[in-house]
């Protein structure tokens, strides 16, 4: 009994220690955020919203401007509709003085989604939640402080929302899918299904890396459930269809062809080979193996 109590105390102390280290390590990042400012694509994607704000438009006008930006960009530049919507609402569109919120939004999304994802897994497995918190803190320390380009990960709205925010959405998405699978009450199933469908539509229209990986993982999970004859409800099929539909809508955008025409093309096979090659190169480079 005494040994168990000692172990629990140690786990609690470690969790508090790592949590404190994480919070203290965020201070320089938060201070730096007050010196950040909009750059490049921030201006182009938020021009319509900024125009509405300057002319005293209300919430409906702002949302209309955002959707118009999505439509225009979808037709003439890129198809990632959900990402473009987020781009159009960058903080400086309302005031350059609040651009620092970029860092707060990204850190909050990353921290909350990581904690939620790990906690969801530990709840299902029946493990000590404090150990899950410790693992979450370790993941966050590594994710935040060893990211290759901090300015694009946490300080630049266009870049950080495209990757950090949508990565956070994917963690939330898989967390909700797990909860949906194990939910017993109808009301919980309905709530989790609605959230999952919404996130599927958002992720399908996000950056292509996250959209593709999320689609592949979900397809693989469904395959495993079928293979092992586990219960698979119509809910998962609906979610997958929404995800893949959003992804396809994003890929077939006329704007993608317009943008591709400005670049030197290569065959699909060559593109895949280059993707795999540079994935290995950058993994080695970013992990210090090369």
Language-model features, listed with the residues they occupy:
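Membrane-interface alpha helices of multi-pass inner-membrane proteins
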Residues: 191-208
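Transmembrane catalytic cores of multi-pass membrane glycosyltransferases
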Residues: 33-93, 98-100, 208-290
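Start-transfer (signal-anchor) and selected internal transmembrane alpha helices
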Residues: 1-27
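Membrane-interfacial entry segments at the cytosolic side of transmembrane helices
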Residues: 10, 129, 187-192, 227-241
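Transmembrane-helix motifs of polytopic, lipid-linked glycan transferases
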Residues: 104-129, 172
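Hydrophobic core segments of transmembrane alpha-helices in multi-pass, intramembrane catalytic enzymes
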Residues: 107, 162-174, 213-221
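Juxtamembrane "helix-exit" motif on the non-cytosolic side of transmembrane helices
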Residues: 90, 119-122, 144-155, 249-257
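Membrane-interface micro-motifs in multi-pass membrane enzymes
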Residues: 131-181, 207
């Amino acid at each position: 009994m005494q040994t168990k109590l000692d172990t629990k105390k140690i786990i609690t102390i470690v969790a508090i220690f790592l949590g404190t280290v994480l919070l203290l390590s965020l201070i320089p990042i938060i201070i730096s955020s007050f010196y950040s400012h909009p750059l490049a694509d921030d201006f182009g994607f938020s021009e319509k919203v900024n125009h509405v704000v300057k002319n005293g438009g209300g919430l409906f006008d702002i949302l209309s401007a955002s959707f118009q930006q999505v439509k225009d960009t979808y037709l003439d530049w890129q198809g990632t509709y959900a990402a473009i919507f987020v781009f159009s609402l960058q903080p400086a569109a309302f005031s350059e003085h609040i651009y620092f919120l970029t860092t707060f939004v990204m850190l909050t999304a990353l921290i909350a989604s990581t904690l939620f994802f790990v906690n969801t897994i530990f709840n299902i497995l029946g493990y000590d939640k404090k150990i899950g918190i410790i693992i979450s803190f370790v993941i966050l320390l590594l994710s935040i402080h060893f990211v290759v380009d901090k300015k694009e990960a946490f300080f630049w709205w266009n870049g950080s929302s495209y990757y950090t925010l949508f990565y956070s959405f994917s963690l939330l998405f898989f967390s909700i899918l797990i909860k949906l699978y194990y939910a017993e009450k109808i009301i919980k199933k309905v709530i989790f299904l609605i959230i999952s469908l919404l996130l599927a539509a958002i992720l399908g229209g996000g950056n292509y890396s996250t959209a593709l990986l999320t689609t592949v993982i979900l397809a693989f999970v469904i395959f495993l459930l079928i293979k092992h004859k586990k219960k698979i409800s119509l809910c998962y099929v609906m979610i997958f269809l929404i995800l893949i539909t959003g992804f396809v809508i994003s890929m077939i955008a006329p704007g993608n062809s317009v943008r591709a025409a400005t670049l030197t093309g290569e065959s699909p096979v060559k593109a895949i080979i280059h993707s795999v090659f540079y994935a290995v190169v950058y993994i080695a480079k970013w992990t210090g193996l090369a």
